[in-house]
Amino acid sequence: VNLGAILKRHDPDLLLTMWGDTWSLPYLLKLSKEWGIPLPLNRESGRQVLHRPERTYFTYGQVVHRGRQVHLFGRAHIDGHNAMLFHDYGLEGVFELARLTSLPLQTVARVSPGSGISAMQMLTALRTGVLVPWHKQQAERPKTALDLLRADQGGLVYQPITGLHRDVAEIDFISMYPSIMAHFNVSPETVGAERPTAELVPELGVIIEQEQSGLVPQTLQPLLDKRIAFKERLMTLPDWDPRRKVYQARSTAHKWLLVTCFGYLGYKNARFGRIEAHEAVTAYGREALLRAKEAAEDLGFTVLHMYVDGLWVQKDGASDITDFQPVLDEIITRTGLPVAMDGIYSWIAFLPSRVDARLPVANRYFGVYKDGSHKIRGIEARRRDTPSWIVELQLALLDQLAGAQSFGELPNRLPGAVSLLRQAWLDLKRGRVPLEGLVASQRLSKELGDYQVPSLAARAAIQLSKIGKQVKQGQRVRFLYTRGDPGVHAWDLPDPPNPTTIDLRQYQKLLLRAANSILQPLGVDENTLHDWMYSNAGYFGPPGSLPPNQPITLSYWRSRLPLFLKACRPQKAAPRADLYRAGD
């Protein structure tokens, strides 16, 4: 009754909810029907609320679940939890997408950016008198096996030089693939078109018409121009300006449209998609990155890493943006594509594989910029299944290292990092970590009946199903690691777990793994951390400073004793009665 009165009094244009699609609005409508109390969610009284069913689909190697939807008439309803990428660009980003795609506000909030790009392409086609196909019917052109191997290569990825590096600049191509489509006129109808102005695609032997602008470049060019304009405005606005948040949200919405447009170019069901155009874009991208590498090396820089649309370069004596500006200018000259300096790292660490430390991993690194901020990729803090307490500890270790005043002071920050780790170890052992911080989550990749050996997420979902809570394929399940069978306790069960059943060893393992990712570049391996924590051994100095078989002399002990005592001194923390107590 109160909600109905509020809606009539204020008559809002927009209802912004969390879980409104899947829970609150369906529940309120159900109560309204059962009790006979009208609930005017719609402005148009003669229309019924539109319900759209939930669905599960497979995309990019993972199963995704989209909850049911509640659409209103006369006013908009957006569910922040069920809206696509709402956490990235918020309400301002949704408004910007609606302006760009001409899709209804409630629709554009819930569909993927790919659907937005498809709508923009159809608008371009209608404006230019091009018929829009109902379904894609154009098949891929026949290829020999050699042609397929040559064309189907994707982006260029180098193996980075592992370890710590100082004064490294990260140079990125601005919206590389969309820029390639616009600059080289890559579109389904221009690829393979024999015209006097056609140009040859590197490596592929395919030609692209350059005389008449294609449908895809016509769609993307205004979007690219608008995003660059927002970027330029953001660079001139002070941090306190309220417009920064709005411009950033709109720019992020543009970014997702531009990121998706490349994938849609090769999507089998895209109306204006064509695999040959997709392959041409990646070929141009590989050529551009190689030219960028050659430009940097010709100017005396060392290329530490290259990854699809960016490269990391270093040169003795180069530490300021003016030192790297000649590289940017030369890359623009040689490629014809826009580039920008993502930032200059005081130091950056490229990490090796966990399976074989001799092998580098392309997208597993972390570094600290000159302004003190940091960037992480491929480590535990970026994974959605990592407990929040582990994430906080890993970021605290990184902040500890980031406090070094210079590259040479990094080893001196190691005792403080070990102290943080030991304090976290003791907090876990003594039951001082809130259960909320230990919750892990994983996606349910199959229906429960399809598992031959249930995963951890499946075991937690089975527990929930026994109390009537059904988890669908593609949804995430939250749980705690416990000892014994079944090894997990579903977090959404009504009864909390017995504190003595928490699997401390599993969380200790996760803790050491996360700490190892940060401390490994300083020479500390996981076995060393294991020994330090389990045996309560002290820290004497950076690993490698003392040969394994060399005896510890009295002078060495005296020089390292302050560091040892500092690392072994845990911070005092009062126990709390509302937190669990470890059983062992």
Task: Describe each model-derived feature in a short phrase.
Residues 264-283:
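Gly-rich Lys/Arg/Thr-decorated short loops/hinges at beta-loop-alpha junctions or inter-strand turns
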